[in-house]
């Protein structure tokens, strides 16, 4: 069995965030509605929420120095260095169910989460 050497691109950190097909597809739809191909989805962690930290999402046109960059199906996801330490190995998904549709982050680093799913503690 032969292995192909892969080049390392320091702007890409695939362990910072795992993105599902459904999450990438939904973000692509949202970007199309905004009519700006330069948009990227920034996923971040901030202080707050009932468990101490909360997840946030915003569109951004710029990749900042130190950002982890994850590409999935033509969509770019960004994570800043501070948030990256909390999101390492986390998965972002988009689910549709009886409760409606929403982005869900499954974070192996979170020790507790609140009922709303957008707040956690480590």
UniProtKB/Swiss-Prot annotation:
Binding residue positions for iron-sulfur cluster: 50, 114, 116
GO terms for biological process, alphabetical: iron-sulfur cluster assembly
Cofactor(s) annotated in UniProt: iron-sulfur cluster
Family annotation (SUPFAM superfamilies): HesB-like domain (SSF89360)
Keyword Transport: no
Keywords: Iron, Iron-sulfur, Metal-binding
CC cofactor note: Binds 1 iron-sulfur cluster per subunit.
Complex formation: Homodimer.
Family: Belongs to the HesB/IscA family.
Stored PANTHER family: IRON-SULFUR CLUSTER ASSEMBLY 2 HOMOLOG, MITOCHONDRIAL
Function: Required for insertion of 4Fe-4S clusters for at least IspG.
Name assigned to this protein: Iron-sulfur cluster insertion protein ErpA
Organism this protein belongs to: Alkalilimnicola ehrlichii (strain ATCC BAA-1101 / DSM 17681 / MLHE-1)
